[in-house]
Structures are given as C-alpha cells and as structure tokens.
Amino acid sequence: GSVTVKTVSTPAGQGHATVAAQIVADVLGLHPNDVDVVTEVDTVTSAWSLASGNYANRFSSVVVGAIAEAAERVASKIKLLAADTLEIAPEDVELVGGNARLVGVPEKSVPIRRLAQRTHWHPAGLPEDMAPGLFETSIISPRLLDSPDEQDRVASAVTFGYVCDLVAVEVERATGR
C-alpha cells in the first residue's frame, strides 16, 4: 500500500511532488517512495478557485502548510488506532518504518497498512467517535486573502514573485575586452 497526497498546486519543474512526499513520509514514519503525489488540477473532480495553481511562491507559503497539517491529522488517527490495537496510550505511539509502535519497543508494533485496512474493512470496530476511512483535507487560507470587496476585487496572492538579473562584466581598458 501507499499514501496518496493530492494538491491543487501545479508545479512547473520545482519539485513539489518530492517535497510533498518528504513531508508526509516524515510525519507518518514512511519512506518517501511510499507516498504518491498527485499535482494536477482537474476542475471536473476538484474544486478550483482563484487561489488554486502555482504562482508567487504559493507552494512554500501555503501548500506546504496544508500538506503538513493534513499529514499530522492522519498521524493522529493512526496513533489512536494503534493505541486501541496495542492497548497503550496514543501519546506512547511512534510511527517508524511503516509501523506504529510503542515508543522504544519495536517488538510491540502494528503495520500502518494494517491500521488503514481496519478503517475500511471493519469500521464498526473503530474507537468511539472515529469516522471510517483514513484521509484528511486541509485548507489554509491566509488572513490577507480576504473576500472580494465592493468592486469585486480580490487579493489572490500571499507573496509576490520577482526576478532580479545581475550581470557582472569586467573590461580590460587597454584592450577593450
């Protein structure tokens, strides 16, 4: 099994998929190769807004935070499931190498994939108040991205891209070269 991350950031070669996989893998105790990242926007299946896409360093200023937040929520659910399965406290669970285990006791563990299967195949046996499934959606909306004003103007960027080109030229006065 693997973890899938879907983001509405559309990279143009900046390595968004690599960064997203590394963040999620780190939070969930997996290898980045165990994380599949979908970095496309299909308006038939995904909500689109003015804030969707890739511009003005939006990925590092907004999307990375949403990815980390969703991964932390999934990790909390996994720890709750592991605690229930292993009969320990959720705060005593660590996620390492694809397993949820008792901190410092690798032998007392359960594969994360087994916990994910439990949420799907046996939802009646989940801890109280836990919804079936193991997925999260995180939306981060910075305060300065306010609603449209009376003239329907809207701020669409948290940061602004810029480019600075610098050229250093050395000329030998004697030869003009």
Predicted regions and their residues:
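Generic long, charged, amphipathic alpha-helical segments
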Residues: 33-39
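Cofactor-centric catalytic regions
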Residues: 1-28, 40-177
